[in-house]
Amino acid sequence: MATLQEKLITPIAAESTTPNNKITVVGVGQVGMACAISILGKGLCDELALVDVWEDKLKGEMMDLQHGSLVLQTHKIVADKDYAVTANSKIVVVTAGVRQQEGESRLNLVQRNVNVFKFIIPQIMKYSPNCTILVVSNPVDILTYVTWKLSGLPKHRVIGSGCNLDSARFRHLMAEKLGIHPTSCHGWILGEHGDSSVAVWSGVNVAGVSLQELNPAMGTDRDSENWKEVHKLVVDSAYEVIKLKGYTNWAIGFSVADLIESMLKNLCRVHPVSTMVKGMYGIENEVFLSLPCVLSASGLTSVINQKLKDEEVAQLKKSADTLWGIQKDLKDL
């Protein structure tokens, strides 16, 4: 006897079983779920997979998202502890990792995350060998290097979220000070995501007008308007948000969806993201730092050769040396 479905639907051709734009998010903590929501909100994928070791939380988040699928463009939302659920992903977003314990050294924190990534990355590669991996876990620059080493992927397919968010914060704060919209205020934060990031004051402009030409002291201690404070606020803003609400998640979620959109839609937009910078600006070691990069359907396809002042190059090199000081002592890579 025919089922209701068979009575209702007459098949004409076999359905495709392979998704066109599948995205996987590894880790369903605050950041992972903010990434998932932002990806779904932009309608970037035809299938979203969630993976974590936390089974109940994983199932709960999946069900909660599925129940909202009526108003989303993505109706297929899956989740499992088994990485088989991630098969055929185009982009894999890694947000998983361990948190720093009180008094723990940065090297020890990174080494513990290396041990986590030694499980995650081979599983990703097993089921989605043709994917691009976007690393969000902190410290993002070092863990992007770790991912590159563990995955065996070419460097254009391993990208760190890097300073995309730092630059967004920078533009927001400058625009607020100038009373204009952030999209009309252009500026870049490069280097390490975090305390040693580099504000490229020489490139800050509005409508092509260099702000440093109007105020040559901009970004220095001699500046009576104290624009340098804007960069300090960028660096401190994550700590401030964490102090107020316990974690940061929404801004990084929006930032990640922004990067994914550039890749899946082949937009060739320029973003400050973490890439392998050996051989650039006199950097001699295999470190990942943020530079202005072109993101397209192939991944990270080009780096923009931004003209930097000598002091900005020196700051970049200092960032690279700091990261290499930790990376060179990592074990089991």
UniProtKB/Swiss-Prot annotation:
<feature type="binding site">
    <location>
        <position position="106"/>
    </location>
    <ligand>
        <name>substrate</name>
    </ligand>
</feature>
<keyword id="KW-0963">Cytoplasm</keyword>
<dbReference type="InterPro" id="IPR018177">
    <property type="entry name" value="L-lactate_DH_AS"/>
</dbReference>
<comment type="function">
    <text>Interconverts simultaneously and stereospecifically pyruvate and lactate with concomitant interconversion of NADH and NAD(+).</text>
</comment>
<dbReference type="InterPro" id="IPR001236">
    <property type="entry name" value="Lactate/malate_DH_N"/>
</dbReference>
<feature type="active site" description="Proton acceptor">
    <location>
        <position position="193"/>
    </location>
</feature>
<dbReference type="InterPro" id="IPR001557">
    <property type="entry name" value="L-lactate/malate_DH"/>
</dbReference>
<comment type="similarity">
    <text>Belongs to the LDH/MDH superfamily. LDH family.</text>
</comment>
<keyword id="KW-0560">Oxidoreductase</keyword>
<feature type="binding site">
    <location>
        <position position="248"/>
    </location>
    <ligand>
        <name>substrate</name>
    </ligand>
</feature>
<dbReference type="GO" id="GO:0005737">
    <property type="term" value="C:cytoplasm"/>
</dbReference>
<feature type="binding site">
    <location>
        <position position="138"/>
    </location>
    <ligand>
        <name>NAD(+)</name>
    </ligand>
</feature>
<dbReference type="InterPro" id="IPR011304">
    <property type="entry name" value="L-lactate_DH"/>
</dbReference>
<keyword id="KW-0520">NAD</keyword>
<feature type="binding site">
    <location>
        <position position="99"/>
    </location>
    <ligand>
        <name>NAD(+)</name>
    </ligand>
</feature>
<dbReference type="InterPro" id="IPR022383">
    <property type="entry name" value="Lactate/malate_DH_C"/>
</dbReference>
<comment type="pathway">
    <text>Fermentation; pyruvate fermentation to lactate; (S)-lactate from pyruvate: step 1/1.</text>
</comment>
<dbReference type="InterPro" id="IPR036291">
    <property type="entry name" value="NAD(P)-bd_dom_sf"/>
</dbReference>
<dbReference type="GO" id="GO:0006089">
    <property type="term" value="P:lactate metabolic process"/>
</dbReference>
<dbReference type="GO" id="GO:0004459">
    <property type="term" value="F:L-lactate dehydrogenase activity"/>
</dbReference>
<dbReference type="InterPro" id="IPR015955">
    <property type="entry name" value="Lactate_DH/Glyco_Ohase_4_C"/>
</dbReference>
<comment type="subunit">
    <text>Homotetramer.</text>
</comment>
<dbReference type="Pfam" id="PF00056">
    <property type="entry name" value="Ldh_1_N"/>
</dbReference>
<protein>
    <recommendedName>
        <fullName>L-lactate dehydrogenase B chain</fullName>
        <ecNumber>1.1.1.27</ecNumber>
    </recommendedName>
</protein>
<feature type="binding site">
    <location>
        <position position="138"/>
    </location>
    <ligand>
        <name>substrate</name>
    </ligand>
</feature>
<feature type="binding site">
    <location>
        <position position="169"/>
    </location>
    <ligand>
        <name>substrate</name>
    </ligand>
</feature>
<dbReference type="Pfam" id="PF02866">
    <property type="entry name" value="Ldh_1_C"/>
</dbReference>
<feature type="binding site">
    <location>
        <begin position="29"/>
        <end position="57"/>
    </location>
    <ligand>
        <name>NAD(+)</name>
    </ligand>
</feature>
